[in-house]
Curated annotation (Swiss-Prot):
Tagged with keyword DNA-binding: yes
GO biological process: pyrimidine nucleobase biosynthetic process; regulation of gene expression; UMP biosynthetic process
Taxonomic source organism: Methanococcus maripaludis (strain DSM 14266 / JCM 13030 / NBRC 101832 / S2 / LL)
GO molecular function, a single term: DNA binding
Stored InterPro entries: GfcR-like, PRibTrfase_dom, PRTase-like
Pfam families: Pribosyltran
The protein, known as: Transcriptional regulator GfcR
NCBIfam families: PRK02277.1 (NF002620)
Length: 205
């Protein structure tokens, strides 16, 4: 396992970040984030990492060189806008936190209503939350056709949660993500569109 990834996970843990936020920051699954925070020190001590089974296999994506630049992000948003040329919709919902910058740029480029969905994994409370909430301009999308935007889809859980929530107040038509790690094409009847998709090829010697 990449040493840099382990060190980043441990640093975020020591800063008080919960597993959900670590997963979001490093573009890994919550399961992998939890594994790294609990076992990171031992993994660093090991001379070589043990062979992982398929259930523990995850892919680390880093696109800091893009998301750190508003100009580069705008170029990505323009690609998504081009993919939206045949989709009729009224609003853009960005999934917090990674999807918000792109959703903002897309809504500005196409002059659409903008809103934010905050998933339950980002709500830190003693009581267990069953869902997230619309964090901005909910009234602007009620009863409207909307698209959902996120940066990376790992397991699809946050996207599924967002779709279920929005179906109660609006009509989600499509989901757009920059990078898809899940291989999922549809959730709750809503199609998933991606710019890039990762996969694992098992090559047996």
């Amino acid at each position: 396992m990449k040493k840099e990834l382990i060190l980043k996970a441990l640093k975020l843990r020591d800063m008080g970040f919960p597993s959900g936020d670590i997963a979001e920051e490093l573009n890994i699954s919550v399961k992998t984030a939890l594994y790294l925070t609990l076992n990171g020190e031992e993994l660093l001590k090991a001379e070589e990492s043990p062979k992982e089974d398929s259930e523990k296999l995850d892919i680390f994506l880093e696109w800091d060189n893009v998301r750190a630049s508003s100009r580069r992000l705008r170029n990505i948003s323009k690609i998504i806008c081009d993919m939206l040329s045949d989709v009729e919709f009224d609003g853009v919902v960005g999934i917090s936190s990674g999807g918000v910058p792109l959703a903002t740029l897309i809504s500005d480029e196409l002059d659409k209503n903008f809103s934010i969905y905050v998933p339950k994994k980002h709500i830190h409370t003693e009581k267990e939350k069953t869902t997230g909430f619309i964090g901005q301009n909910m009234s602007s999308i009620v009863g409207k056709d909307v698209i959902i935007v996120d940066d990376v889809m790992t397991s699809g859980n946050s996207v599924k949660e967002t779709i279920k929530y929005l179906k109660g107040i609006a009509n989600p038509k499509k989901v757009f993500v920059v990078m898809d790690k899940s291989g999922i094409d549809e959730i709750e009847g809503v199609s998933i569109e991606h710019l890039f998709r990762t996969g694992v090829v098992d090559i047996k010697k």
